[in-house]
Amino acid sequence: WNSVSSLICRERPVEPLESELIDWTVCAATRSSLGPNFVRILGYFREDGTDSVSKIEAAMRAKDPVAMVMAAHTLKGEALQFGALRLWGTAEVIEMTARACVEHHDTPDELLELVVGLRSMFEETLAVLEEDASPVVRERHPLGFGRQFG
């Protein structure tokens, strides 16, 4: 692991992840498993995710990789349960890079670009999930070409 963490922290540039925003198969499985509690749990994701993003941003400002690790780990787990692949992957890179920085007594400066884009990625992901979870959106069906939605 030490050789891997060294690569992560010092030798490999951190780049934004280009993956699918939502894995709808995972999201559907979570929705099925949670049933009517899905919307409530998604609300917790909004609250906890916002808190995690704020903690990651504060840790970046303080150049504190230790504080960054737990918040990124929490965000990563919550994102994965909803199939939020891009957010999960970004949180994973932040967590693993911050862990490597802790081991090497280094600052997480190379994470700046990812951390700066994290809040907008979280908000975009959440908006897509909430729109999909909205009963109004799910119940709208097109009536045909050129007709209004029913």
Question: Positions of the model-derived regions?
Answer:
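Two-component system phosphorelay core
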Residues: W1-M70, T74-G150
